[in-house]
UniProtKB/Swiss-Prot annotation:
Assembly notes: F-type ATPases have 2 components, CF(1) - the catalytic core - and CF(0) - the membrane proton channel. CF(1) has five subunits: alpha(3), beta(3), gamma(1), delta(1), epsilon(1). CF(0) has four main subunits: a(1), b(1), b'(1) and c(9-12).
Swiss-Prot/TrEMBL keywords: ATP synthesis, ATP-binding, CF(1), Hydrogen ion transport, Ion transport, Membrane, Nucleotide-binding, Thylakoid, Translocase, Transport
CDD domains found in the cross-reference section: ATP-synt_F1_beta_C, ATP-synt_F1_beta_N, F1-ATPase_beta_CD
Protein name: ATP synthase subunit beta
GO molecular function per UniProt: ATP binding; ATP hydrolysis activity; proton-transporting ATP synthase activity, rotational mechanism
Domain of life: Bacteria
Length: 484
């Protein structure tokens, strides 16, 4: 802890502007950029104040400008500041599983200290080119629409795009649940600038679904790192790196395949923009920081597969005003292997997960990677849905009866496909009342092939809604027929 630090380099606060603190050090003893500074003192009310800051600028005249990782309430000019001579470091290893940390690696779940001495600095180089694994392989998620139309790459980066309230966090929770159960893999969750209530709900739901076991933490499958909306921008800007550092240890030292969830990568950019303005940098397009591309690259390039293990990253991307050309989502796009775009139109129809089958893309959807059969089924599904989309204007003006026989068949099959792309989630059982379904890729393909071939043309549309495999569709259709 801070109290055990040797005070070899001590400065004092000269200025405080919100989360930005200026510190003066003795001549010739300036800390380096990204060094952690600690301030431990008592405020005027006699309460303990403990703040960690990160050096961002060297101002000249032996002064540095640092950004605080927690609230600066209670700090005053003249307080003593200790240079730790190292970057912020966080605990790593199996002892982190089942625990909740803040940006500087302190546990915030009231379960006592972390039982590990292993710590890693949050700033590191990306793996070298020669260490990277370049052979592509698909990561099965058990979610039909994802596995069929926009499959995820093992060790790749996936973006979950959507406006407010279309279900990004629910999909993330379902993926954590499915990966833990189907693959037995560990996950690291970075809560970047999202609602504290959601963080609390996520933790409780993970306990309910046995992803976290508070009685026996060694059985837990996920470590959580939170820097929520109420935290200063410094914490929100760095919490993604803290989570990534924990994931890197599982990849490089434990030699595991890890899932890294970042919810929400837009808040990481937003926090960087706030810090940039506080540091007095000239804003770039739409008021974002001029270093937007660099900051994003430093984070994203560390998320990759090496010959030892992989980090597969799933990042929720809030799209401001549903505008995909905004610099924040646009910069994120450049790094992604797959995009899962959530559509407000589908959500309003009650189709969940509200993944847009035409807008969602993946570099893995190639015959050489997924095989010809998978590729052909996926493209046939998309072309049927695309034709339905083109016909919707005609239907709205003239009605369904004015369409040709072939087009009416396309519409009927497209509506079944649209409904069959929905599926009940394990983590949403409380809301839907339907038991969750994990659908294997071969079952997904079998179902869509049967719809496309016309084998199921005589089944009613509602039989395809909110089910798992095609066998459940047939059973539901028989049940509906019996009730009619």
């Amino acid at each position: 802890m801070v109290s055990t630090l040797e005070k070899t380099n001590v400065g004092s606060i000269t200025q405080i502007i919100g989360p930005v603190v200026d510190v003066k050090f003795p001549s010739g003893n300036l800390p380096e950029i990204y060094n952690a500074l600690t301030i431990t003192a008592k405020n005027e009310a006699g309460q303990d104040v403990s703040v960690t800051c990160e050096v961002q600028q060297l101002l000249g005249d032996n002064q540095v400008r640092a950004v605080a990782m927690s609230a600066t309430d209670g700090l005053v000019r003249g307080m003593e500041v200790v240079d730790t001579r190292a970057a912020i470091s966080v605990p790593v290893g199996n002892a982190t599983l089942g625990r909740i940390f803040n940006v500087v690696g302190e546990p915030v779940d009231e379960l006592g200290p972390v039982g590990t001495e292993d710590k890693s600095p949050i700033h590191r180089e990306a793996p070298k080119l020669v260490d990277l694994e370049t052979q592509p392989s698909v990561f099965e998620t058990g979610i039909k629409v994802v596995d069929l139309l926009a499959p995820y790459r093992r060790g790749g980066k996936i973006g979950l795009f959507g406006g407010a309230g279309v279900g990004k966090t629910v999909i993330i929770m379902e993926l954590i649940n499915n990966i833990a159960k189907a693959h037995g893999g560990v996950s690291v969750f970075g809560g970047v600038g999202e609602r504290t209530r959601e963080g609390n709900d996520l933790y409780n739901e993970m306990i309910e679904s046995k992803v976290i076991n508070p009685e026996n933490l060694s059985e837990s499958k996920v470590a959580l790192v939170y820097g929520q909306m109420n935290e200063p921008p410094g914490a929100r800007m760095r919490v993604g790196l803290s989570a990534l550092t924990m994931a890197e240890y599982f990849r490089d030292v434990s030699k595991q395949d890890v899932l890294l969830f970042i919810d929400n990568i837009f808040r990481f950019v937003q926090a960087g923009s706030e810090v940039s303005a506080l540091l007095g940098r000239m804003p770039s397009a739409v008021g974002y920081q001029p270093t937007l591309g660099t900051e994003m690259g430093e984070l994203q390039e560390r998320i990759t597969s090496t010959k030892e293990g992989s980090i597969t990253s799933i990042q929720a991307v809030y799209v401001p005003a549903d505008d995909l050309t905004d610099p924040a989502p646009a910069t994120t796009f450049a790094h992604l292997d797959a995009t899962t775009v959530l559509s407000r139109g589908l959500a309003s129809k009650g189709i969940y997960p509200a993944v847009d089958p035409l807008d969602s893309t993946s570099t893995m959807l190639q015959p050489s990677v997924v095989g010809k059969e998978h590729y052909d089924v996926a493209r046939a599904v998309q072309s049927t849905l695309q034709r339905y989309k083109e016909l919707q204007d005609i239907i709205a003006i003239l009605g369904l009866d004015e369409l040709s026989e072939d087009d009416r068949l396309v519409v009927a099959r497209a509506r079944k496909i649209e409904r069959f792309l929905s599926q009940p989630f394990f983590v949403a059982e409380v809301f839907t009342g339907s038991p969750g379904q994990y659908v294997k890729l071969e079952d997904t393909m079998k179902g869509f092939k049967m719809i496309l071939s016309g084998e199921l043309d005589d089944l009613p549309e509602q039989a395809f809604y909110m089910v798992g495999g095609i066998d459940q569709v047939i059973a539901k259709a028989e049940k509906l027929k019996a009730e009619a």
